[in-house]
């Protein structure tokens, strides 16, 4: 995983078979290893072509971070990526195993609802900002080193979630979570209309159907030469 072009060159020089170019928008833990300066880390749109140029056509570059629909996939391919890695979208799939508290927060996800924080594990990771993150600040020098921070919080998280509260919950997702939620609700509405059913709009599309939909959207965008 490379979060800068410098890291991509290092990985290439050390014989990796492929590189995941992880933009600043990506959910979950950061893969940075040559720099700890989070403020200087590029987003996916800027990172992918620089990683592609850094390694040439010798190994594939996989784009990751903020890619939530076919438009994002098409954009990554146009920037030179050989493939994409998508995570947050699948949190909304029927097979998703995220807990009820996490699901409730995902349903109301929006574009400015995530932060990079070291509070939960001692390492920077992107997720929905809960009460703990808001009160301690997303990045704190008081946090124990990885992985001790996560162990210390487990009991608090479990007790709060038993009460349906997300105060101490690590709810990893990327900056595209709001778009993922909108797409999931649209798929749910189409399902309900087709099957004359009602119920939860999110978490009804299977991972297989989601993958097919995303691929079809991307192919349509690439075929037309525009992202609509």
Feature map (PLM): residue ranges:
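Short, ordered loop/turn segments at secondary-structure junctions
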Residues: 3-4, 24-25, 89
């Amino acid at each position: 995983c490379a979060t800068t072009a410098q890291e991509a060159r290092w990985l290439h020089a050390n014989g990796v078979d492929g590189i995941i170019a992880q933009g600043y928008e990506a959910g979950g833990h950061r893969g940075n290893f040559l720099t700890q300066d989070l403020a200087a880390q590029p987003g996916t749109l800027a990172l992918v072509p620089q990683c592609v140029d850094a390694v040439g056509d010798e190994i594939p570059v996989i784009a990751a971070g903020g890619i939530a629909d076919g438009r994002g996939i098409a954009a990554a391919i146009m920037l030179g990526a050989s493939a994409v890695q998508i995570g947050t979208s699948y949190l909304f799939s029927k097979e998703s195993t995220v807990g009820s508290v996490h699901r409730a927060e995902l349903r109301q996800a929006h574009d400015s609802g995530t932060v990079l924080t070291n509070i939960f594990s001692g390492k920077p990771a992107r997720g929905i900002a809960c009460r703990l993150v808001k009160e301690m600040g997303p990045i704190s020098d008081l946090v124990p080193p990885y992985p001790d921070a996560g162990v210390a919080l487990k009991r608090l998280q479990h007790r709060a979630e038993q009460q349906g509260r997300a105060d101490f919950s690590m709810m990893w997702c990327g900056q595209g979570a709001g778009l993922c939620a909108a797409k999931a609700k649209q798929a749910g509405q189409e399902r309900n209309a087709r099957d004359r059913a009602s119920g939860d709009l999110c978490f009804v599309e299977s991972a297989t159907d989601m993958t097919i939909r995303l691929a079809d959207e991307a192919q349509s965008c690439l075929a037309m030469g525009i992202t609509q």
